[in-house]
Amino acid sequence: MTHQKRLSVPKSWKVGKKGNKWISTTRPGPHSQARSLPLGIIIRDILKLVDNSREGKRILSEGKVLVDGIPRKDLRFPVGLFDVITLPLVNEAYRMLQDEKGRLTLHKLNETNVNKLCRINNKTTVKGGKFQLNLNDGTNIIGSNEYGTKDSLILSIPDKQVVKHLKFEVGNLAMVVGGQHSGETGKIMEIREVKSSRHNTVMISGETDFETIEDYVIVIGEDKPEIRLGGEISE
């Protein structure tokens, strides 16, 4: 495994500074290293399913850990925001969320038959007049022109069928995933388009009213969140 010094891990990694000097890195994949955790660290240091890398390799090779419904067998596989980890043998599931400090945290779910939330980062035209939707977790799916950039989709897993379409518009609920308001949720009150090289901004009303840049905002529901945001946090 490729390693880095524990003291130099990204700020989004909620791992202790004490322990082994070296810690594994993520492999290039659906999420960047700055916005994901290696699966090996999750099963060893957070869920405490194993004591070492050798045991981790064994349970992954046996298909006992699913990410978004797919068995993953690489200790360095990157697990990022909104990804769902399922442990079929113990009938448990967890969703990766972000806390107010921008750190990735695993929240235990009440059931294992859950869906996945994704944001449409951009879309491209493909043959037949259809559109390829490029999602925030690296997934690409074919959809129609009704789906807009910055909209969110609720997808079934592992087959990634659209269960619900959430528009990026005033009145819907959103989560902030970057900046000083990271981890906060609230209602979109205004979307301010800037006719310059500066970022578009969004006014959000939650526990307080605040403004953040558009790229940090992900729609999570209409009248209520479409995904469970609470639950026991694994540390």
From Swiss-Prot:
GO cellular component, one term: cytosolic small ribosomal subunit
GO MF annotations in UniProt: RNA binding; rRNA binding; structural constituent of ribosome
GO biological process entries: translation
Signal peptide positions on this chain: none
Pfam families per record: Ribosomal_S4e, RS4NT
Domain S4 RNA-binding: 37-100
InterPro entries recorded: KOW, Rib_uL2_dom2, Ribosomal_eS4, Ribosomal_eS4_central_region, Ribosomal_eS4_central_sf, Ribosomal_eS4_KOW, Ribosomal_eS4_N, Ribosomal_eS4_N_CS
Classification via CDD domains: KOW_RPS4, S4
Keywords of this entry: Ribonucleoprotein, Ribosomal protein, RNA-binding, rRNA-binding
Family that this chain belongs to: Belongs to the eukaryotic ribosomal protein eS4 family.
Official protein name in the record: Small ribosomal subunit protein eS4
Organism: Methanosarcina acetivorans (strain ATCC 35395 / DSM 2834 / JCM 12185 / C2A)
Gene: rps4e
